[in-house]
Amino acid sequence: MADFKIILSDPETGRSYKIDATGPAAGGFVGKRIGDEIDGDVLGFAGYTIKITGATDKTGIPSRRDLPGPSRRRLLLSKGVGFHPVMDGERRRKSVRGNEISADIVQINAAVTQSGAKPLAEYFSQPEAAAE
């Protein structure tokens, strides 16, 4: 089973949280595509809805939303994800990955689309150390 690092952004607070997903939590993402919404219960966030906004594979190659499938391809790009031109009209052949989440993906970018009853900050707050 694949392991993922999920970067979850909360647009209400402007904060991002890192989650290490393994086992069944990671299995809920395999086969999904960029733009799909999943239930937050997969990661343990009751009442939340999460939208997949992007991904990166083990070599740092980004996934493009407009490219179907999980495979890596070399495309001639003029703009968008994977290439930012310096000069007008510049094009370059760059490696990009398709929009499907597979076992080769390491990092998944996601955003909260619907919040639950409990704020995300409470899920990630660390207990304070007792002063001695």
UniProtKB/Swiss-Prot annotation:
Q: Which UniProt keywords apply?
A: Ribonucleoprotein, Ribosomal protein
Q: Which gene encodes it?
A: rps6e
| SMART domains for the chain | Ribosomal_S6e
Query: So what family is this one in?
Result: Belongs to the eukaryotic ribosomal protein eS6 family.
Organism from which the protein derives? Methanoculleus marisnigri (strain ATCC 35101 / DSM 1498 / JR1)
Looking up InterPro entries in the UniProt record yields: Ribosomal_eS6 (IPR001377), Ribosomal_eS6_arc (IPR020924)
- HAMAP family from the UniProt entry: Ribosomal_eS6
Q: What is the lineage of its organism?
A: Archaea, Methanobacteriati, Methanobacteriota, Stenosarchaea group, Methanomicrobia
Q: What are the recorded GO MF terms, alphabetically?
A: structural constituent of ribosome
In Swiss-Prot or TrEMBL terms, this protein is called Small ribosomal subunit protein eS6
GO BP terms: namely: translation
Q: Name one GO cellular component term.
A: ribonucleoprotein complex
| Top-rank taxon, per record | Archaea
